[in-house]
Amino acid sequence: MAVGPTEGKQPPSESFSPTHHQIIAPSPILAVPTLAFSAAQVEIVCKTLEDSGDIERLARFLWSLPVALPNMHEILNCEAVLRARAVVAYHVGNFRELYAIIENHKFTKASYGKLQAMWLEAHYIEAEKLRGRSLGPVDKYRVRKKFPLPPTIWDGEQKTHCFKERTRSLLREWYLQDPYPNPTKKRELAKATGLNPTQVGNWFKNRRQRDRAAAAKNRIQHSQNSSGMGCRSRRADGAASPTPSDSSDSDISLGTHSPVPSSLQLQHSPGSTSNGANDREESLSVDDDKPRDLSGSLPLPLSLPLPLASPTHTPPQLPPGYGGGAGAGPGGPLTGPGCLPPFKLDAATSLFSAGCYLQSFSNLKEMSQQFPIQPIVLRPHPQLPQSLALNGASGGPPLHHPAYAAAYSVECVPGGHGPPHPPPKLRINSPEKLNSTAVAAAASVGGGGGNQHHEPTTTGYHHSGQLMLHRPFSTSPELKHSAPEIT
């Protein structure tokens, strides 16, 4: 016996009236209604729901899409659908699916901003969960370096100074045309670069400030370079200009700087034109064997040091009868006859007295190396008796003693008889000959006055009042009562 009614057959023992409804079992294919949406319609719906921010409805819509549709592959590869799926995965916390969607599909530049933000924020959230704290700027920078943007949502253009290189190049072009754009140009430039007018104005302000600083720095460098070139040119001119030290190798005359007699002109040999210092020193040698006329032409600094050459100082005078009395009056000129101290002139001292030194600071080093200045030592000599001083005191013996004449080669004739004689010509021998001959003269003349004791003084004057000047390191004999040297 049949339990239930068979399909298409009436039960044999029961009859149904025609008014009864037939029960039809539903087909499993027709259980869910089919959505006849095209790919364009699905894209529009996804964009609308994404822009509205209703993520739940967007998620339900994506879930309701049929899988067996013939155009399902085209719908799933649509950029709007992929972006909607990425937004839903980000909001539900399914970051693995978000990374897969972004890395495996190429997007256009219109989707770069949103997808880049979701990529970075997803990595920030994961890093915060791992570290258990919020991330700082440095931590976020490290995350960005560890997980760079994939090329599917990034064109590879680096950001420099907060702007892309393309934006900066466009701003530079506009800046070269007009560094002070008006608001209208700022708006146009902002529209062309994708920035706002405030950003454009700030960039122009910063660029103008940088240019002003660079211009000031360039001006300082230019002034320094010009001053350096001027110094070098002045040095070159100073080296090329004729100076008394290197003007002419044939004949160097010192008479143009100070009244030095022509007998002290530095004679150069014809072959002394080499550039070496030794040749120059040889060419500046002075003949020591010729008598020289040193009367009245030596400048004051050669005769006395600076403290003794003051106008208020009265130098020691000659006896009234010597040399016709020229320059012997009190307060008379120091350059008169007979006031020449016994010291030796060398090339360096002659150049110094002639004013060849310190012509300019540019050749100071070269001149000091070629002609070193030797100091003059003031040393009293009590071994010379009072009668043998060159400018002896009045009442002493005459100056024509044969031993004295042999020591100093002075042609001395007592004054006061006959016409005045020319100033004496002094031949200056070496310190050894001078001192030894002078000591012999003192022994022959002083004779019994050897026991006479002369008290040493601390000044540069001899006990007779005459200033004695000698070359340094002279070979004068050591005396018991000699005064200390004054340099």
Curated annotation (Swiss-Prot):
Keywords: Developmental protein, DNA-binding, Homeobox, Nucleus. It comes from the Eukaryota. Disulfide bonds: none annotated. Residues 255-277 have a biased composition (Polar residues). The keyword Protein transport does not apply. Residues 154-214 bind DNA. One of its GO terms (biological process) is regulation of transcription by RNA polymerase II. Residues 278-293 have a biased composition (Basic and acidic residues). Gene3D superfamilies: Homeodomain-like (1.10.10.60). Residues 294-312 have a biased composition (Low complexity). Coiled coil: none annotated. Pfam families: Homeodomain, SIX1_SD. It is found in: Nucleus. GO terms for molecular function: DNA-binding transcription factor activity, RNA polymerase II-specific; RNA polymerase II cis-regulatory region sequence-specific DNA binding; sequence-specific DNA binding. PROSITE patterns: HOMEOBOX_2. Belongs to the SIX/Sine oculis homeobox family. This is Protein Optix. It comes from Drosophila melanogaster (Fruit fly).
